């Protein structure tokens, strides 16, 4: 399963791990992706989303209905 937030689109980044001796090796910075079930009153059902913790804060701010409308407008099936 891909590590991409359905709300923000956050995905893994590539960077360096830097040692005390300043040696650099490649590493991945992974987003904090969570599976979360939300109750959608208008549809009378639960919706499960894979989203980052920032995505959860966006849902708290805008509401689940507005966020679902944006996701569906992108053509993603929920």
Curated annotation (Swiss-Prot):
Q: Where are the transmembrane segments?
A: none
Please name the GO terms that the record assigns under molecular function: structural constituent of ribosome
Name the Pfam families for this protein: Ribosomal_L28
Note whether RNA-binding occurs among the keywords.
no
Q: Name one GO cellular component term.
A: cytosolic large ribosomal subunit
Mention one GO biological process in which this protein takes part, according to its record. translation
The UniProt keyword set, sorted, is: Ribonucleoprotein, Ribosomal protein
Entry's InterPro entries? Answer: Ribosomal_bL28, Ribosomal_bL28/bL31-like_sf, Ribosomal_bL28_bact-type, Ribosomal_bL28_sf
Q: Which family does it belong to?
A: Belongs to the bacterial ribosomal protein bL28 family.
HAMAP family recorded: Ribosomal_bL28
- The name on file for this protein is Large ribosomal subunit protein bL28
Q: Which organism is it from?
A: Legionella pneumophila subsp. pneumophila (strain Philadelphia 1 / ATCC 33152 / DSM 7513)
């Amino acid at each position: 399963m891909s590590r991409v937030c359905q709300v923000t689109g956050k995905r893994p980044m590539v960077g360096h791990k830097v040692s005390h001796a300043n040696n650099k090796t490649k590493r991945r910075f992974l987003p904090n992706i969570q599976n979360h079930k939300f109750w959608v009153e208008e549809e009378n059902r639960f919706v499960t989303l894979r989203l980052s913790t920032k995505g959860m804060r966006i849902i708290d701010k805008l509401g689940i209905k507005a966020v679902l409308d944006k996701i569906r407008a992108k053509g993603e099936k929920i």
